[in-house]
Design a protein with these regions (language model features):
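Exposed, interaction-prone extracellular/peripheral surfaces
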Residues: 1-4, 14-22, 28-35, 43-47, ...
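Short domain-edge segments at the starts or junctions of modular domains/repeats
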Residues: 10-11
């Protein structure tokens, strides 16, 4: 939590679901309600109560639906669920505000390709439900975001949602990053002086590398399609795929480091492995900050 001096009022705004009832300015709300002839509420935001903000940007492209439960590889939806739950729990433990953004389809007619944006908010009251459960429910949407969904998401945060995200906001971008973002997208996001954290979710066998399946007739599924096709790779093709995948990951992590971003690599959907990866990132971050002091 970032605290200002004293408890001076920093600003006021209309009430939104999720705001604490204690933050309502009842006198100002009464005046506004009387003037407009209906119930309207004003919320006070104080310097001393300015909480840290965490935003989760979740990639919902078809490749993020891999791999099915019956296969012995990384189940990305489950890994993303564990990542999301740990980040939300950590933010709430620090009394932070949590926001969410993706470009997939959702219930109630929300179409793929349009921002599904939930501004940062605190833990909901008991009768409104648990914020952790609500965020996890967002992950039940479709895996049908466009290929440039992450670029659109970062552009949305830098424009339409910018007013909700002060300097120092943590923005966790969760994706397999197999569809690269343009340097300009990262540059515009970095200009906002947010704390950007890429979380790379890739299967260690099929995406970080490639298995030795030369000569074996192998069924492969195309992301976003229910059908599978049978393919057979020779030794040269296997080696080319392996080198290409390894180079892609190495290049991705190198690019992130060049931008000053500490990426997290997730290659397992086991809760303990996910927790260990995030804990290692947090410890490394604390160590790096200690060196700068």
């Amino acid at each position: 939590m970032r605290r200002g001096e004293g408890s001076d009022i920093a600003s006021s705004r209309p009430y939104e679901p999720g705001d604490h009832v204690h933050a309502i300015d009842w006198k100002a709300s009464a005046r506004l309600s009387a003037a407009h002839g209906n119930d309207e509420f004003i919320v006070r935001e104080r310097h001393a109560e300015e909480m840290s903000r965490v935003v989760l940007v979740i990639d919902r492209r078809p490749s993020m639906a891999l791999y099915p439960d019956e296969l012995p590889w990384l189940n990305k939806p489950r890994a993303v669920e564990f990542v999301t739950d740990l980040l939300v729990a950590s933010a709430l433990n620090q009394r932070g505000l949590v926001g969410y953004l993706d470009l997939g389809s959702h219930a109630n007619g929300h179409e793929a390709g349009t921002p599904f944006w939930q501004r940062p908010r605190s833990q909901l009251s008991t009768w409104q439900g648990d914020l952790r459960e609500r965020v996890l429910d967002y992950l039940s949407g479709g895996f049908d975001a466009p290929d440039d969904g992450l670029e659109r998401a970062l552009a949305y945060l830098s424009t339409a949602a910018r007013g909700s995200l002060p300097l120092g906001t943590f923005v966790f971008i969760v994706s397999d990053f197999t569809a690269p973002l343009s340097p300009g997208s990262w540059a515009r996001a970095l200009e906002q002086r947010w704390d950007l954290v890429p979380i790379v979710v890739q299967d260690p066998i099929w995406e970080q590398s490639f298995p030795s399946i030369q000569g074996v007739l192998t069924p492969l599924a195309d992301p976003g399609r229910s059908t599978r096709r049978l393919v057979r790779f020779d030794a040269k093709q296997v080696e080319e795929r392996r080198r290409a995948n390894q180079a892609r990951l190495d290049g991705l992590l190198t690019d992130f480091a060049g931008l000053g971003l500490d990426a997290v690599l997730i290659g397992s959907s086991n809760p303990n492995d996910v927790h260990a990866a995030l804990l290692s990132w947090a410890e490394h971050r604390a160590e790096q900050r200690g060196r700068r002091i």
